[in-house]
């Protein structure tokens, strides 16, 4: 957090496939976040979380941060950084320990979570998040906060989110070369869920789907706890590439066509428009029918949504075998830039057979005209996450303590290498 003229400021930085966004929020006395600065730069040098041109990424970060600093009238020294890639992995684990005294203490909780996370994870991966799902004391299960309760043995179920260490190192390196400290790296899907989901939805059971440019992030909450997280390495950009390939148009022209004429389902008969490429999108002497373009878009969106539904059904079957609750009474919540295409709600309802909501960031004030669109769910969520780190005395602080050692390892690696 940054202190500027007695203001408590938190900064989120999203380095995505399509854009680099810096968002500055002031944490008000009532705990709300007021947006006071934003910087946006078109991404260059990164694709689906992997850096392929470090200098280009650094340049984008600097430009984005500079814009936000001017608008917020502050100097940014540290950020909360989002991360999404196919190299993100998740697993649910269990830890069991005896209760040391007559009642559960914070030390008992630290011990049981340490036991739960001391498991084998993928090679070259580090634990990014350790998120408690529920505690059990002796025969009593479903406990959210066991502090002060009596018993002889405590069990915890946790959700682990891990990432490839080199992927994280490279993104952190890019930020630190801009003389900016990384307060914490946060899985993008987790950040987005903080921005768009309500407490009731999480308790009822909900799957949040953030459809970005390079990746789709999934987070599933059951009974208020995260049960599954997943990254699909295909998203909005592949739709643009399909249009480019099908109609021999440039990538930038295809993106414009997708945004202006795209739809996730076929149009009503007689409503298709003629797309004159020669006058609108360059020097092509070519016309397209909107229906033809939509066929390409609809096919790809159907494929992407079916991939997501397969994951949802897999998790449902797995939890059912474990004898655990699995209901998405809260439905499906879609967000991210690629969720704004026309008629996506209708398309998704056919595939998921559940109620669908297209979500914008919640619980913010200030420069809301700039960021209250699905495109900014992740970076707004980073601010909510950062705020909780400072003001929540329970779960968030416990989670942070478990990744401090990981950040120390990252820091030590930098010192050795550079």
Swiss-Prot record:
Record-linked Gene3D superfamilies: 3.30.1490.110, 3.30.420.40
Membrane topology, as annotated: Peripheral membrane protein
Chief localization: membrane
Database matches in SUPFAM superfamilies: Actin-like ATPase domain
Family: Belongs to the FtsA/MreB family.
Subunit structure: Self-interacts. Interacts with FtsZ.
Protein name listed in UniProt: Cell division protein FtsA
């Amino acid at each position: 957090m940054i202190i500027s003229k007695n203001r408590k400021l938190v900064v989120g930085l999203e380095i995505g496939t399509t854009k680099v966004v810096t968002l500055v929020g002031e944490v008000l006395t009532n705990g709300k976040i007021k947006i006071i600065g934003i910087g946006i730069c078109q991404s260059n040098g990164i694709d689906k979380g992997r850096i392929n041109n470090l200098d280009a990424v650094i340049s984008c970060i600097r430009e984005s941060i500079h814009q936000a600093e001017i608008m917020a009238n502050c100097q940014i020294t540290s950020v909360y950084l989002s991360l999404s890639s196919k190299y993100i992995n998740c697993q649910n684990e269990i830890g069991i320990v005896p209760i040391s005294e007559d009642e559960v203490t914070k030390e008992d909780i630290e011990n049981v979570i340490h036991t739960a996370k001391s498991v084998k994870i993928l090679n070259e991966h580090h634990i990014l998040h350790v998120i408690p799902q529920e505690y059990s004391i002796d025969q009593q299960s479903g406990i959210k906060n066991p502090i002060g309760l009596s018993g002889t043995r405590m069990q915890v179920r946790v959700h682990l989110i891990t990432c490839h260490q080199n992927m994280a190192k490279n993104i952190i390196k890019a930020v630190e070369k801009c003389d900016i400290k990384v307060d914490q790296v946060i899985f993008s899907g987790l950040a987005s869920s903080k921005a768009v989901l309500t407490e009731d939805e999480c308790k009822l059971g909900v799957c949040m789907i953030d459809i970005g440019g390079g990746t789709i992030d999934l987070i599933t909450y059951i009974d208020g706890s995260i049960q599954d997280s997943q990254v699909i390495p295909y998203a909005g950009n592949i739709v643009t590439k399909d249009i480019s390939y099908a109609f021999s148009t440039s990538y930038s022209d295809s993106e414009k066509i997708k945004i202006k004429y795209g739809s996730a389902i076929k149009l009503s008969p007689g409503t298709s428009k003629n797309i004159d490429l020669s006058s609108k999108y360059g020097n092509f002497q070519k016309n397209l029918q909107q229906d033809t373009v939509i066929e390409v878009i609809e096919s790809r969106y159907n494929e992407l949504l079916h991939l997501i539904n397969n994951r949802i059904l897999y998790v449902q079957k797995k939890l059912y075998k474990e004898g655990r609750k699995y209901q998405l009474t809260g439905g499906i919540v879609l967000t991210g830039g690629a969720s704004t295409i026309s008629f996506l709600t209708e398309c998704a309802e056919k595939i998921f057979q559940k109620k669908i909501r297209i979500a914008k960031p919640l619980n913010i004030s200030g420069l809301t005209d700039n960021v209250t669109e699905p495109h900014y769910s992740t970076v707004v969520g980073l601010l909510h996450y950062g705020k909780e780190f400072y003001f929540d005395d329970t779960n968030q602080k416990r989670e942070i303590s478990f990744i401090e050692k990981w950040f120390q390892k990252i820091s030590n690696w930098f010192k050795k290498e550079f």
